[in-house]
Design a protein with these regions (language model features):
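Non-catalytic accessory regions flanking glycosidase/transglycosidase catalytic cores in CAZymes
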Residues: 1-246
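Extended catalytic-interface subdomain
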Residues: 222, 240-263
Length: 263
């Protein structure tokens, strides 16, 4: 039986900065034109990333940025977004009414450069629905491995000698709907398999294990979100507990009525 202890902090008002992060995804003009304009654009930019956006975000100093989704994460394959940009494949995005081609110009290295410029930590959401544990593990290896391997040599050829040290990894996205229509039990099984595939990146003081974040329930459905959470953690508490650093709750405001106040 696994136990979780909640400790009430009396007289302390501390909110972890990571809870105040941001989220970017290829929906509408969030990525293309919004963040990425390309190095040849007439819009002022830093290596293809909009200068005005970077300057504004440097003032905000967001603690963490989540990418590539969202819904798009479950059809995104990271290898499409590395290497010379002119050689990257063009894919298609059908998520949330976008219906646009993705030239994959904004990939892993561009995301990391954006985060480095604005002082944010990256949160990479892996592809659980159309990807595999092997694809996830290779992405982690490419980003974080110190030792010389085929993947780390490829990272160096692509312009980044040192590991990226990506801490946060989202394991699935909205798995109760577009991320696979899973039940809590199904997701718990998949979560165990994926997180068990994560590399540890060393041992002892040198270890840098990924901080895995589970996909939470549909926050806009009060009864379902409670039942989902209970069922998921009931499954997770059986036998050997997998690695779990965080629980990603999703709440939207589109079903809330705007309150009108009289002046």
């Amino acid at each position: 039986m696994q136990k979780i202890t909640f400790r009430k902090l009396i007289g302390e008002n501390y909110i972890y900065p990571e809870l105040q992060g941001h989220f970017i995804e290829f929906l509408g003009s969030c990525i293309y034109d919004g963040i990425w304009v390309g190095e040849d654009s007439e819009i002022p930019n830093y290596h293809g990333i909009r200068k005005d956006l970077v300057d504004a975000f440097q003032k905000l100093h967001p603690p963490v940025i989540r990418w590539p989704g969202g819904c798009y994460a479950d059809v995104y394959h990271w290898r499409n977004g590395i290497g010379p940009r002119e050689n990257r494949p063009v894919t298609y995005n059908e998520n949330f009414g976008t219906f646009e081609s993705d030239p994959n110009q904004f990939g892993t290295h561009e995301m990391m450069e954006f985060c480095e410029m604005i002082g944010a930590k990256p949160w990479f959401n892996i592809n659980m629905m159309t990807g595999s544990p092997a694809e996830m593990r290779e992405w982690m290896e490419y980003c974080n491995r110190r030792e010389s391997t085929t993947l780390t040599r490829e990272r160096k050829v692509n312009g980044h000698e040192a590991p990226f040290q990506v801490e946060y990894w989202g394991i699935g996205n909205e798995v109760w709907d577009g991320g696979g229509k899973m039940t809590p039990q199904m997701y718990a099984d998949e979560y165990r398999k994926f997180t068990s595939s994560c590399p540890s990146f060393g041992s002892g003081d040198q270890a840098f294990p990924p901080k895995c974040i589970a996909s939470g329930p549909d926050g806009n459905k009060p009864k379902e979100r409670v039942a989902w959470t209970k069922d998921f953690f009931k499954e997770m508490g059986k036998y050997r507990m997998p690695s779990l650093y965080g629980y990603d709750l999703h709440f939207y405001n589109w079903n809330l009525k705007q309150l009108q106040t009289e002046k």
